[in-house]
Curated annotation (Swiss-Prot):
Ranges annotated as spanning the membrane: none
GO biological process terms, semicolon-separated: response to hydroperoxide
Domain of life: Bacteria
Protein name according to UniProt: UPF0246 protein Spea_1078
NCBIfam families assigned: PRK02101.1-1, PRK02101.1-3
Similarity field: Belongs to the UPF0246 family.
A GO CC term assigned to this protein in UniProt: cytosol
């Protein structure tokens, strides 16, 4: 099975990575085209487009300016160790065993507004370009139009090469909209995580994001290779609810914390 997750806004390029191994993104030619578009933006443009402070806008204008296509361990970092945020807190990549990290490199893919699709050990340079950004480009008015079928084609190629029957979608709606589900050759499974609050089970964003990362960790550490094995996920008190689930949306519940 192939696993999809979102990236994170928070980045860590200060601490050393958890592995010396690295790979290269496959869609850097596309990334370079986006960088050329972004380099035409002023700090004011970026602040408005991304709805960020002047300070963050200035930082990202500088990032666009210094971005270069030749990635090395000196000017870039492996994606799974660079991203920080709720999903990555749940995954805790720094403590993955070498075996689990190898499985991650095969099975895990990170959607990205700038890089399209990243393997965990793909080097990346720091950036901020969320998939929902309405960045006008030669292919349209936003990044969904820019990426078109490219990400979906990459996923189909990967699942074909690996013989993967299912894609486990643990990405946010914003990022998964860059994928064309009807054009996927593998089956699509989208787990749902609900926490009990005031007697009702509901999706609580912070908990759900962390749970997505914990499920990735569970799959990697336990070498999960079937949907039945996936329903055994029980990290941090979550449990599979058969009565609330459908074939394509397994639901995991947790009692009030």
């Amino acid at each position: 099975m192939l696993i999809l997750v979102s990236p994170a806004k928070t980045l860590d390029f200060d601490n050393p990575p958890g592995s010396e191994n690295y790979s290269m993104p496959t869609l850097l030619d596309q990334s370079e085209q986006l960088i050329e578009v972004c380099r035409k933006l002023t700090p004011t443009d970026v602040a408005t487009l991304m709805k960020v402070s002047d300070k963050i806008a200035g930082l990202n204008v500088a990032r666009f300016s210094s971005w270069q296509k030749e990635f090395t361990p000196t000017n870039a970092k492996q994606a799974v160790f660079a991203f920080r945020g709720d999903v990555y807190t749940g995954l805790d990549a720094d403590t993955l065993s070498p075996q689990s990290l190898d499985r991650a490199q095969q099975q895990l893919r990170i959607l990205s507004g700038l890089y399209g699709l990243l393997k965990p050990l793909d080097l990346m340079q720091p950036y901020r370009l969320e998939m929902g950004t309405r960045l006008a480009n030669e292919r349209g008015t936003n990044l969904y139009q820019f990426w078109g079928d490219i990400i979906t084609d990459e996923l189909n190629q990967t699942t074909a090469e690996q013989g993967s029957e299912f894609i486990i979608n643990l990405a946010s709606n914003e990022y998964f909209k860059a994928v064309k589900p009807k054009k996927l050759n593998a089956g699509l499974i989208t787990p749902v995580f609900k926490d009990c609050k005031n007697g009702q089970y509901k999706v609580i964003s912070f908990f759900a994001k962390k749970a997505r990362g914990m499920m990735v960790r569970y799959i990697l550490d336990n070498n999960v290779d079937s949907l039945e094995a996936l329903t055994k996920f029980d990290t941090a008190g979550y449990y599979y609810s058969e009565k609330d689930s459908t074939v394509n949306e397994p639901v995991f519940l947790r009692e009030e914390q």
